[in-house]
């Protein structure tokens, strides 16, 4: 491991048990949990609240630490740093989900944990499975996917963000 990046994410569910996911705008347009990098001198909990607000417009609080996931391996031949991701369970205190970081996120939508969209980041996949199983305090190493499937561009842009949130 040549370098390590620290990041945060959160599993946020609605009253129906659906999980809020973000679709990345760049690269393979992977689905992921809301979150981002931890800034210098910032606590993981503060970073999670800040990043969720910046990406989704939601005010949240962290309920518990779902786990710490170390993302390792190369992605499609790229030499990327390992990522140490603190993943929390979070509850919404206020606001309506909306894309607040259009340069980073193309859309937000709620998904049933049994019918998750693809392609998805391996960390999100593992964390959602752990959340559904009722686990907390998980310590897990997760390998990057070598070749994520690419969504069809027409399908990826067909659904408007507001319609996706209404599901």
Functional labels for PLM-detected ranges:
Residues 1-19, 37:
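Conserved N-terminal beta-strand and adjoining loop/helix that marks the start
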Residues 129-167:
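Charged phosphate-binding loop/patch that engages nucleotide di/tri-phosphates or the phosphate backbone
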Residues 71-97, 130-135:
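Active-site-adjacent beta-strand/loop module that shapes the phosphate/pyrophosphate-binding cleft
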Residues 99-133, 164:
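NUDIX/MutT-family hydrolases
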Residues 33-66, 88:
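The catalytic Nudix box helix
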Residues 4, 29, 82-84:
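Residue-level preference for beta-strand/loop junctions
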Residues 12, 87-91, 109-112:
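Short, well-ordered beta-strand micro-motif
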